[in-house]
Amino acid sequence: LYSVIAHDLRSPMGSIKMVLNMLILNLPAEKIGDEMYELLTMANQTTEDVFSLLDNLLKWTKSQIGKLNVVYQDIDVVEVVDGVIDIFNMVAGLKKITIREEKPEKLAVSADIDMLKTVVRNLISNAIKFSNENSEVLVKLEEKDGTAVVSVQDHGCGIDEEGQKKLLHTDTHFSTFGTNNEEGSGLGLLLCQDFVVKNGGKLWFTSKKGEGSIFSFSLPLKK
């Protein structure tokens, strides 16, 4: 049922998202005024959040009922992360957030590229959501102990100890709000953990309330 609802709602929401993205790109505040631009930005952010939630819900449900299989292929993690960052630069710019990247020339793994993109998208989206304005999100890629490690660090609200205990557990509900009151359901992180484990890796995090969080995952390097 969840997958049917998410699928039926995702397409029209995607169309609305595309229109709002085009309006923001072509209608700067100087043209329509600060108040109207702020309303447009809020509508765009809300639509992005709803679309992301529907997309995560659809993938999570399919994964749980065994309808998502891992399709292994040779992937350069650096190339995948670069592509996701390009997509999120505009979203980050709306909060005056800079995405900085530290990376080697190449990190080769054998994994499902769609699942990998979903994980990176969710982690970067969350980092932007929970970062303060005029701050930086650091995306670090490195080779460590035979694995490719990707870490996404924000300088935002962080998670308290009680919240950390609930995160990444399907039997506990954890939701919170971003620095601009963007809603977070916790579903995206559960999906990230599921996809990383399915590809033979692991996901972990460190966080401190009021200072920010670092979410990391590893995948075995291509042999």
For the regions a protein language model found, what residue spans apply to each?
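A conserved beta-strand-to-alpha-helix junction within the catalytic ATP-binding
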Residues: V71-D86, K117
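Short alpha-helical segment of the dimerization/phosphotransfer core of two-component systems
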Residues: M42-V50
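Conserved catalytic submotifs in the C-terminal HATPase_c
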Residues: V71-D76, G93, T98-L107
